[in-house]
Amino acid sequence: MQQQQFDQLTTAEKREVERQLHLYMDGAEEVIPPEELRAKLAKSILTGEPLKIKLGLDPSAPDVHLGHTVVLNKLRQFQENGHIVQLLIGDFTGKIGDPTGKSAARKQLTDEEVRRNAETYFQQFGKVLDQNKVELHYNSKWLKRLTLEDVIELAGKITVARLMERDDFEERIAMQKPISLHEFFYPLMQGYDSVVLDSDIELGGTDQHFNVLMGRHFQEKYGKEKQVVILMPLLEGLDGIEKMSKSKNNYIGIDEDPHEMFGKTMSLPDSLMKKYIHLATDLEAEEKKRLVKDLETGAVHPRDAKMLLGKTIVNMYHGSKAAEAAEQQFKKVFQQNSAPDNITAVHWQGGGTVPVTDLLVTLELLPSKSEARRMIQNGGVKINGAKAESIHADIALEHGMIIQVGKRKFVKLQMHQ
């Protein structure tokens, strides 16, 4: 049947199928299975019906960072080719919490937390997707209506052995850590979402392999055509080791200040440059290849490639003017050893002298005195451009004093009597 549909297409239509197939598979870690993706594209062109592309979101951590955009950029490719984007907010499943990669049970969210996080998600996604061309769904709409009889029927369509194939469940059993019964229902409900939405394709990161395959499993059990699964690579964070995550503080948020975004990009390990060029930018494919080749041959210095990468990323989320300003400020601060033009003013009542560690903590430049001492000992604190040498120093406060912590944090003291 799949080949018959493809054979019915004109030569131009077949070329269009292959163009889209190449586009969607480019950069993907895995497509399950590729031949079904080709067949779905052929059917879409033959019937004129767009495909329905699902992305499920667990609204437990609503701040969107570059790691999320790897999947979002792929979703945008489908959107730009006329297909339907189904953004599924797991407001019901979010109360359970996805156990993927967790060595312990997760805290359940309240209705208000889920709603607030979902709104934040959608607002930030507008920087990547056309919000006017997105179907927004909340799975509480159908999951809340399930009766106990429905739930038992759903549970009867999968075995415990199949659910135990999850690596995280196996690890928790081996470590003698508890698994609550309700956690087994997360993949069941995620799979059932695909049944209700009748999704043709589901996107996810490679860490979602088990969950997104549940959609195929349950669609087949309910007599529907199985969705294709497209898994995108995970983007390592600024530490170059762990997956990008706000909780690990190794992230670049798409809502961050342009200067901070640019500075963080410049701190990337050289080893991540190629991956970020491929997955985190909107550069044309040929430009990506050329830049990567120049890096490999030494035709371009990693620092200069990072400057282009930083400017490209800031431009994507804040526009060209902000990107240009961020680049110029970075050059001024780090290459010319000057303070930035726009320094945050902090207010101080009174005057006199203050221990340097107290000053840094009071101004919330560092979270604790121990952190302040460590930063001073590592040469990371400057007062009016001069390095703070002693953790026991008393600082004579003055109006307009510039305090620098680390490479990118500057404040200017505003004195009030």
Swiss-Prot record:
A motif ('KMSKS' region) lies at residues 243-247. ATP binds at K246. It comes from the Bacteria. Its EC number is 6.1.1.1. It is found in: Cytoplasm. A motif ('HIGH' region) lies at residues 59-68. This is Tyrosine--tRNA ligase 2. It comes from Bacillus licheniformis (strain ATCC 14580 / DSM 13 / JCM 2505 / CCUG 7422 / NBRC 12200 / NCIMB 9375 / NCTC 10341 / NRRL NRS-1264 / Gibson 46). The lineage of its organism: Bacteria, Bacillati, Bacillota, Bacilli, Bacillales.
